[in-house]
Structures are given as structure tokens and as C-alpha cells.
């Protein structure tokens, strides 16, 4: 951030705040009640965990990993996890589009909640535009579903002005992407939820990579979710609407959701029987690579700090200093400041 922008921000912020405070619009209730919660603690009691147990016993202390490259397989795996979940589903995403893919997955998650599965969904607020607050508040009205927004702008109707007034805070976004079932199976990677990420749009060709995993590392993935979920920056969606949707609103929203899903065409089959779903997971299990693994995640408190060097950078620098032959990295973005570029070039020249 250059100094000119900081000067501009300091001059403009008081004006923007005055405008926003004077506007008759919905603002976030930061004192909205929040109840802490954590991941399911007994994944070994679930049916899906039993599918992996024999293979896991042969690789004590290791986790199973499977790379999921194609969009179709990535989406079907998420649907299988939603359909087979028995205890919990945790989802954390930067973007959850309200297109066909977003509605289909939301519908399957609703079915899981109807079966008694506890659902927690954490979405970054950056793309919560229009009437999305009311829509997800209606979904949040389900007794087994709770949705929170990460680091929301205070003023919901004057988002652009609010963003400028609070730039120092709201410029810190949550790009984490994970989907965890019963704390037994997890999926992490580069895909958000939307048509463009799963091979549905003919005019887009996004190339992303997911990792489906089981074993000890799933507990680490869940712990990272809990850290963000229980942070002061994760705000219940009910805090973002002036009036909570009624039960009639919720039922009407869910009916339209189901109708839209049923009416939507899709380029590949998305409905499978329970036996077919289990067979899909067994096939993945039989191709697992068993290895040690670790989860690296920035702490949500970075929203309130200007620290340049975070957990990820420190870990990457450490790995680079230890590498003997090669290091493989796949990332949709690899943008480095000049100082970091020189550092990594030094490691490359050393070998």
C-alpha cells in the first residue's frame, strides 16, 4: 500500500463514516450472540470412517491423500460427502455463487441437515452482494444449519462506501477453501463453489486442484476451521439483516431452491444411490497415497494487523532452506514482492 493512498484514506475516511452513519440502511450487529462450537470428536464412530479404517490401520500415523484434478470428480466428491454425512458438515469458502452448482450443493446440504447432520458454513463477505444476506439468512434458519460471514463490511446497503471507510480492516479476506465430513474426510484446494470451478460453463476453462484426504490430517483441517469459526471476525448471518426471515420466508426460499435445482440442466449426472456413493469413496480410498502431512493456515487475527510475514511465508522459506533436490508447488497465484523474489532466486541458484 503506497503512502499516497494512506493519506487519501485518512482524509476521506471521516467523511465516509459520517455519510454511512447518517444513511438509513442495514448495518452489521457486532454484538449479535455467538455460541462457540467445535468439530465432531468421534469420527471413528461413523460409517464413512469405517470405510477407510482398514487402510488407515496399515499406515499408522500417516494420512491418505488423493489429488482430484477434474471439475466433475471434484464436485461429485463434495456431493458424495454431503449425501453420506452422518454427524457434521463444515464448509469454508471465499466464494459461494448462487448459480446452478451453488444451488445444487446447497440443496444437498439442506437434505443432510434434514437428516440431523449439523452444518456449519463460513463464507467470506467480499462477494455477499444484493439480496444474498436475506437468502442465506433463510437457509441459516434451519435448526441444524448455522452460517457465518467472515469480516463483513458494516453497512450492507452502501457496501462500496463502507469498504472504502474501513479499508484497513476489510482488505483482509479469507481465501480458505475446505469441505469436511464427520471430521473423517476432508477436501481442500483451489476451488470455490460455482459453475466455473467444476467444468459446467462452456465459456470458462478454470484449472484447479483439490486434495481429498483422511487420517490424522483431517483433524488439523477441522482445527483450522474451528479457529476461524470461533474468531471475533466470523459474524452470524443473522447479524447482517434488519429483520430475520420468517418460517414462511424460509420454506418459500427452500422450495424455490429445490425447483431451480430440479429445473436446471447439468453436463454430467449428479444423482447417485448410496451404494454408488460408497463405491466412489472406496475407489478413491484404494488409490490413496499414504504420507505424513501438515496444515498451514494464517491466523484470523491478521485482520487486525499489518504484519508482512505470515505463517505460510515462514513455512515456505523453511522448506526452501531444507530442500536437497526439488520442491513442487501448485498455486493459482504466486505473486512475490521483490525482496521475496530475490530470496527464492538465491535458493534456486544454491542448487
List each language-model region with its residue ranges.
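Charged, low-complexity intrinsically disordered terminal segments
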Residues: 24-175, 181-351
Amino acid at each position: 500500500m503506497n503512502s499516497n493512498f494512506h493519506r487519501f484514506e485518512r482524509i476521506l475516511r471521516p467523511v465516509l463514516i459520517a455519510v454511512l452513519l447518517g444513511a438509513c440502511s442495514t448495518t452489521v450487529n457486532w454484538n449479535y450472540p455467538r455460541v462457540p462450537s467445535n468439530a465432531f470428536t468421534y469420527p471413528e464412530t461413523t460409517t464413512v470412517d469405517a470405510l477407510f479404517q482398514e487402510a488407515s490401520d496399515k499406515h499408522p500415523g500417516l494420512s491418505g491423500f488423493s489429488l482430484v484434478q477434474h471439475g466433475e470428480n471434484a464436485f461429485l466428491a463434495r456431493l458424495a460427502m454431503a449425501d453420506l454425512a452422518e454427524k457434521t458438515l463444515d464448509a469454508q469458502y471465499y466464494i459461494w455463487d448462487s448459480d446452478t452448482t451453488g444451488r445444487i450443493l446447497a440443496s444437498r446440504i439442506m437434505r443432510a441437515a434434514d437428516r440431523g447432520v449439523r452444518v456449519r458454513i463460513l463464507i467470506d463477505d467480499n462477494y455477499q452482494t444484493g439480496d444474498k444476506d436475506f437468502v442465506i439468512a433463510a437457509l441459516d434458519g434451519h435448526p441444524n444449519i448455522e452460517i457465518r460471514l467472515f469480516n463483513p463490511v458494516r453497512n450492507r446497503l452502501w457496501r462500496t462506501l463502507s469498504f472504502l471507510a474501513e479499508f484497513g480492516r476489510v482488505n483482509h479476506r479469507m481465501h480458505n477453501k475446505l469441505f469436511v465430513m464427520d471430521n473423517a474426510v476432508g477436501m481442500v484446494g483451489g476451488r470455490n463453489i460455482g459453475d466455473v470451478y467444476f467444468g459446467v460453463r462452456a465459456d470458462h476453462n478454470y484449472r484447479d486442484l483439490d486434495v481429498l484426504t483422511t487420517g490424522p490430517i483431517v483433524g488439523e483441517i477441522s482445527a483450522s476451521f474451528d479457529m476461524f469459526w470461533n474468531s471475533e471476525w466470523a459474524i452470524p448471518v443473522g447479524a447482517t439483516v434488519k429483520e430475520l426471515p420468517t418460517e414462511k420466508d424460509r420454506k418459500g426460499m427452500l422450495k424455490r431452491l429445490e425447483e431451480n435445482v430440479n429445473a436446471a440442466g447439468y453436463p454430467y449426472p449428479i444423482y447417485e444411490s448410496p451404494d454408488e456413493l460408497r463405491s466412489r469413496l472406496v475407489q478413491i480410498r484404494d488409490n490413496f497415497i499414504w504420507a505424513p502431512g501438515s496444515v498451514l493456515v494464517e491466523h484470523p487475527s491478521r485482520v487486525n494487523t499489518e504484519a508482512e510475514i505470515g505463517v505460510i511465508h515462514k513455512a515456505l522459506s523453511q522448506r526452501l532452506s531444507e530442500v536437497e533436490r526439488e520442491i513442487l508447488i501448485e498455486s493459482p497465484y504466486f505473486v512475490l514482492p521483490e525482496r521475496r523474489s530475490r530470496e527464492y532466486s538465491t535458493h534456486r541458484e544454491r542448487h
